[in-house]
């Protein structure tokens, strides 16, 4: 992909939702646009701006001359805790309090002689206040939904669940009385779904629940944008993509997986844009280099999932008793309200076989030949990176559309198997052995490699996602620049 030759470069303002799983794909998009000659302004919240400085250093924030960082308040009380904030509070606050400071920022950028005129605003799909800001200034606005296409479609049907009387549930008994096994047969392009496969935010007894209302309303508001982009590829989610285009919007561009699309960017330049809010422990790569191909169980619950100390111990002894090498990511905040503490006898049992670190460069880990299976929460970043690496999955969804991604990984793409919510160590041992030692696991691995090859085809020169990215720049962005 060649860069754009122009005296005044196009200028994209990018606005991620303030969580690691949203900052990463927006940064990947910024990296891709920058490689095509765009000037980038990347807008974090003040809390995440501070975290990025701690993780990457002030020199990273100072950036390149044409890739700049700005920050706006999120409306929440100040905290210096190195963790993702409480998601419902954060979501409610961003939609209520971010519009005014964001408008002020856009006005400042427009008035500055040191930056090019703003060509477009590209905001996270759950930062839809940016649509109002863009309309205020007459700037094109593009929504980047960082979910899967099936997750996006599910959120668009929150209102239909209410209309049909399915949501809200009468009381909490629905969680264990079989109600969640009820078929959901009214979502176009998503056959064979059950309520348990829908995003977890539908599991409410009050439709005014913050996250149920937030995700449904943000999804519908995003349809007002000039275009929507998704970090997926057509062959992976063709049926639901066709349904979205037919029912809602034809201005949807599938431009992923980003992790493969960005391979055309020179490595030195690409490394300059890593956006982890935690410090990445690179010792894991050397550790993996010493392992046999397909021998390691990689475990990461993502940036938001929290577990109990009891669950931590079940995972620990399940991994230890499996007798397979493992790389386990244990964030400082992974245990609810406590520090993650494991007994000395666990460390003795896994000596020379297990590595525990707080955060890693996951894209590199999932591309490493030593990794044999990925135990994941099924967030979309992790899922699409896993597909891009050709790795099978052990799925343990936590919240949001992770349940939907798990359903597709296990039943549609056939690359995964699901763990029980109330996990016990014996089950984990059994599943790891199944995925690492049996024909079931080998078949899941073959399927994962097939999906990786299709992703590589989509993102190679002339592939569908590659061409869609070109079209996105020309149709959704640059045609407005000439007006």
From Swiss-Prot:
InterPro entries: UDP_glucos_trans (IPR002213)
GO MF term set: linamarin synthase activity
Protein's name in the database: Linamarin synthase 2
Catalytic activity: 2-hydroxy-2-methylpropanenitrile + UDP-alpha-D-glucose = linamarin + UDP + H(+)
Main function: UDP-glucosyltransferase catalyzing in planta synthesis of cyanogenic glucosides. Able to glucosylate acetone cyanohydrin and 2-hydroxy-2-methylbutyronitrile, forming linamarin and lotaustralin. Also accepts, to some extent, a wide range of potential acceptor substrates, including simple alcohols, flavonoids, isoflavonoids and other hydroxynitriles such as p-hydroxymandelonitrile, mandelonitrile, (E)-4-hydroxy-2-methylbut-2-enenitrile and (E)- 2-(hydroxymethyl)but-2-enenitrile.
EC numbers: 2.4.1.63
Family named by the database record: Belongs to the UDP-glycosyltransferase family.
CDD domains tied to this protein: GT1_Gtf-like
Binding site for UDP-alpha-D-glucose: 146, 360, 362, 377, 380-382, 385, 401-402
Tissue/organ expression: Expressed in the cortex, xylem and phloem parenchyma, and in specific cells in the endodermis of the petiole of the first unfolded leaf.
Active site: 22, 124
Binding residue positions for an anthocyanidin: 22, 400
Transcription regulation keyword on record: no
GO biological process: defense response
UniProt entry keywords in alphabetical sequence: Glycosyltransferase, Plant defense, Transferase
